[in-house]
Design a protein with these regions (language model features):
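N-terminal, polar/charged subdomain of small-to-medium soluble alpha/beta proteins
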Residues: 1-114
Length: 114
């Protein structure tokens, strides 16, 4: 399993006009269940998943997103990662830190799996 934690991204997301005015800071963590059998034999990145490509894909996807809810963003992103990087399972956690202090919470996040 590949685990990438707390990837910093920007996305235009929210319900309030002030939220949609400028992109918000979010973090994405993703677990990609993928067989290491082939890459373990060959030691060739072409037989595995390049972490840098995953990170770049996540940042570009979020940067292009323009929507209202983090639930939809998380679901679409998770599905897109699974399609682009063939895997048995993708588990994604999307954190929205903007209102954590204002609401007296330790975290605001959604988790989705495909």
């Amino acid at each position: 399993m590949i685990v990438l934690e707390d990837i910093e991204v920007m996305a235009r997301i929210g319900l309030l006009e002030e939220e949609l005015y400028a992109p918000q800071d979010l973090t994405v963590s993703v677990e990609i269940e993928h067989s290491f059998d082939r890459i373990s034999e060959t030691d060739d990145l072409a037989d595995g998943i390049d972490y840098r490509e995953v990170i770049e894909f996540i940042r570009e996807f979020c940067g292009a997103y323009d929507g209202k809810t983090i639930e939809r963003l998380a679901d679409l992103l998770c599905k897109s990662i699974k399609e682009k990087f063939p895997s048995e399972r993708v588990h994604l956690v999307l954190n929205m830190p903007r209102y954590v202090n204002k609401l007296g919470l330790s975290a605001i996040r959604v988790e989705v799996e495909h």
